[in-house]
A protein has these predicted regions:
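A Rossmann-like FAD-binding core segment of flavoenzymes
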Residues: 6, 74-105, 110-113, 175-271, ...
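Residue-level detector of alpha-helix initiation sites
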Residues: 12, 16-18, 41, 124, ...
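FAD-site-proximal beta/loop scaffold in flavoenzymes
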Residues: 131-152, 243-299, 303, 307-314
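FAD-binding core/adjacent interface of flavoenzyme oxidoreductases
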Residues: 1-13, 28-29, 41, 83-156, ...
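Conserved N-terminal glycine-rich FAD pyrophosphate-binding loop of Rossmann-like flavoproteins
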Residues: 40-64, 193-196, 201
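Rossmann-like NAD(P)H-binding beta-loop-alpha module
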Residues: 154-177
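Glycine-rich FAD pyrophosphate-binding loop
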Residues: 28-47, 182-191
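N-terminal Rossmann-like FAD-binding beta1-loop-alpha1 element of flavoenzymes
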Residues: 8-34, 170-175
Length: 336
């Protein structure tokens, strides 16, 4: 290791909601912290794809827009001044003789740390684009893979293709403001929360199941209508639209982390109840983690992050108490 090289107590890979809250809790445990984020801004997939989505699965918060949640998490994380590195993918992992971990960035940057917490979701995300020659031409015009501003869809005829929780949530959010909303899903059953699906079906949203999006019809600039096809009868229908939203999931890749020697199960990093991985000094939290009865909610990740931090603290200092630290009495927060 080079002389005078700065070594961090914890380096968090991932600057999404879980990474940000984990950084805050590292400060609570007086750990020198760095956060490395692959994207050019903090917030992970919430900032990238769901800034306008209302998040309702956090205790004490009836509902909050994704972008607002990220702003509050950034403010909270900044309490203890963690170092933030953006627009950098971690590609290399090695351990020096003294136990220091060296993380290598995509451009050869070196990051020295005593422990690592993986809060990178399921890896890098790339939307599954609609398989059509015309899709690229209309993307960014009136074909969307995310909803950045709800108001952009006000008084518009909107078709949403997809059946997961995000597609259902978008339908419910847009229904009060759009001229019309139709949801096209290739299966009869939806993957969203039961209450959200019920709300959608009881609203004015037109639900077409089991149908698939087949064709985009338009001119050089915009889609004018879409053709949908019944998956069983092959019956087709053209629907006139102003805006098309496609939510067909993501391509997810753990990338180079798969080569680090981590135990992987179902595309995630296997963890014990202390959020420890099989590699000493490496911990995991949020969607990146796999263990039995894992709860895939932001609220669950907000518990796993502090658990990983406490385990990292105990790894660095076996005499340290492996317990929750109450922010109520923390000297840096008590006068806020």
């Amino acid at each position: 290791m080079a002389e005078n090289q700065e070594v961090y107590d914890v380096t968090i890979i991932g600057g999404g909601p879980i990474g940000l809250f984990t950084a805050f809790y590292c400060g609570m445990r007086e750990l020198k912290t760095k956060v490395i984020e692959f994207l050019p801004k903090l917030g992970g997939k919430v900032s990238l794809f769901f800034p306008e989505k209302i998040i309702r699965d956090i205790g004490g918060i009836p509902g909050i827009a994704g972008k607002q949640l990220i702003e509050q998490l950034k403010e909270q994380a900044a309490t203890f001044d963690p170092d933030i590195v953006l627009n950098q993918r971690v590609t290399g992992f090695e351990r020096l003789d003294d136990g220091t971990i060296v993380l290598t960035g995509s451009e050869g940057e070196k990051h020295y740390t005593r422990t690592v917490i993986l809060a990178c979701g399921m890896g890098t995300l790339e939307v599954n684009e609609f398989d059509s020659e015309d899709a690229a031409r209309y993307a960014g015009k009136n074909l969307h893979y995310g909803v950045e501003k709800l108001d952009a869809f006000k008084d518009k005829r909107v078709v949403i293709s997809g059946g997961g929780d995000t597609a259902v949530d978008w339908a419910n959010e847009l229904e009060p403001i759009a001229a019309s909303v139709a949801v096209v899903h290739r299966r009869e059953e939806f993957g969203g929360m039961e209450s959200s699906v019920t709300k959608m079906k009881q609203s004015s949203v037109r639900v077409l199941t089991p149908y698939r999006l087949e064709q985009l019809n338009g001119d050089e600039e915009r889609i004018k209508s879409v053709t949908v096809c019944h998956t069983e009868s092959s019956q087709r229908e053209d629907i006139e639209i102003d805006e098309l939203i496609i939510n067909h999931g993501f391509k997810i890749d753990l990338g180079p982390m798969k080569e680090w020697g981590l135990e992987i199960e179902e595309g995630r990093v296997k963890a014990d109840r202390h959020m420890r991985t099989n590699l000493p000094g490496v911990f995991v939290a949020g969607d990146a983690a796999f263990y039995e009865s894992k709860l895939r909610l932001i609220a669950g990740g907000f518990t796993e992050g502090p658990t990983a931090v406490n385990s990292a603290k105990a790894y660095l200092d076996p005499k340290a108490e492996n317990m929750a630290m109450y922010s109520t009495h923390h000297k840096k927060l008590v006068h806020k």
